């Protein structure tokens, strides 16, 4: 192939899942599965970077940003000096322009797909786990995973990150938080328990520095103002072309950190969330407010510094209908 290929178009339309495309500078793009393409730059001792997008099919801006980077790599306009794996994750949902078809894929990682083997999303989540594990098994330096999203609602902090729960004495890395700050990330949630998300899987089982990045509001293809994504676009391009570049130190006073305090679990269809449908992520919860109720179960705000994250009373019983978070600090060095 001599012209610059469209990676996204190939991912969405082609049944050729084992194609290999020669690229400028001796690079090659190798399709490992539908929507999953690996590009090896100067791989000697290089970082291994996984960029995933489209886990929710209607979150299109990250898809456009990543496809733009791939297009520039293919045209020889962006140098690649790391191992790169890109996943356009939920192809069916991307084609349909919906968040998901049958089940939220970002609740099916960490082996949760085994509980719903009949679902197409489960089959895909298992495939993505396998490919990610194989990719990171070949890593010789840093293992980095950024799972790119946009949110279904507005947010007090437009761009924020979720740092998955860390086991076995692992600590939050200031240099990664500093890099996120450089991207334009305005707040970070330090998760306090395991989750069935893609970034938790790669963090725990691949020992990657992994993050879920929420980068703005979900909009259809063609309706995104990509200038609002210039921070993450520029930072990722810098990472791919010059992964060893110095990053300014973390300014903790300018990057609010939060920890998950507890989940709002929807136990039954009687669950009632006492927040407006339009409530934004990270909205402050007044002290004493009855946040939600579900029969005899009551969730009440305390202290006046708690905030709501990902409120969604429409989830199925047994699932999380929101997270209550509170301010956090990193341990002293």
Swiss-Prot record:
One MF annotation (Gene Ontology) recorded for this entry: zinc ion binding
GO biological process, one term: arginine catabolic process to succinate
Gene3D superfamilies per the UniProt record, alphabetical: Zn peptidases (3.40.630.10)
EC number: 3.5.1.96
Active site residues per record: 214
Any Pfam family hit: AstE_AspA_cat
Database matches in SUPFAM superfamilies: Zn-dependent exopeptidases
Entry note: cofactor: Binds 1 zinc ion per subunit.
Cofactor names: Zn(2+)
Record keywords, A-Z: Arginine metabolism, Hydrolase, Metal-binding, Zinc
Residues annotated for Zn(2+) binding in this entry: 56, 59, 149
Pathway note: Amino-acid degradation; L-arginine degradation via AST pathway; L-glutamate and succinate from L-arginine: step 5/5
Catalysed reaction equations from the record: N-succinyl-L-glutamate + H2O = L-glutamate + succinate
Known role: Transforms N(2)-succinylglutamate into succinate and glutamate.
UniProt-listed NCBIfam families: arg_catab_astE (TIGR03242), PRK05324.1 (NF003706)
Stated family: Belongs to the AspA/AstE family. Succinylglutamate desuccinylase subfamily.
Protein name: Succinylglutamate desuccinylase
Species of origin: Chromobacterium violaceum (strain ATCC 12472 / DSM 30191 / JCM 1249 / CCUG 213 / NBRC 12614 / NCIMB 9131 / NCTC 9757 / MK)
Gene name for this UniProt entry: astE
């Amino acid at each position: 192939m001599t012209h610059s290929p469209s990676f996204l178009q190939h991912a969405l339309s082609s049944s050729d899942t084992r194609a290999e495309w020669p690229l400028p500078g001796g690079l090659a793009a190798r399709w490992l599965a539908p929507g999953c393409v690996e590009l090896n730059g100067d791989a000697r001792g290089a970082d291994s970077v996984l960029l995933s997008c489209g886990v929710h099919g209607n979150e299109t801006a990250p898809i456009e940003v990543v496809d733009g980077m791939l297009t520039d790599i293919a045209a020889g306009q962006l140098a690649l000096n790391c191992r790169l794996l890109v996943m356009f994750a939920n192809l069916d949902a991307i084609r349909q322009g919906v968040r998901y078809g049958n089940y939220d894929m970002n609740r099916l990682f960490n082996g949760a797909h085994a509980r719903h083997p009949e679902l197409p999303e489960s089959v895909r989540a298992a495939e993505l786990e396998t490919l990610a594990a194989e990719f990171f098994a070949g890593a010789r330096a840093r293992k980095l995973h950024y799972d790119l999203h946009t949110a279904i609602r507005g947010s007090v902090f437009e761009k924020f990150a979720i740092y998955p729960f860390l086991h076995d004495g692992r600590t939050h890395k200031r240099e990664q938080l500093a890099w996120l700050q450089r991207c334009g990330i305005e707040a970070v949630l330090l998760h306090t328990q395991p989750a069935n998300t893609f970034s938790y899987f790669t963090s725990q089982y691949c020992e990657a520095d992994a993050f879920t990045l929420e980068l703005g509001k979900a909009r259809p293809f063609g309706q995104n103002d990509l200038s609002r994504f210039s921070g993450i676009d520029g930072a990722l391009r810098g990472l791919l072309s010059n992964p060893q570049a110095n990053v300014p130190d973390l300014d903790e006073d300018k990057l609010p950190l939060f920890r998950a305090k507890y989940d709002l679990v929807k136990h039954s269809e009687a669950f009632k969330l006492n927040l407006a449908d339009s409530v934004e992520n990270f909205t402050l919860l007044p002290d004493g407010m009855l946040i939600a109720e579900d029969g005899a179960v009551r969730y009440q705000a305390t202290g006046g510094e708690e905030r709501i994250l990902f409120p969604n009373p429409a989830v199925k019983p047994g699932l999380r209908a929101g997270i209550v978070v509170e301010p956090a600090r990193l341990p002293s060095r």
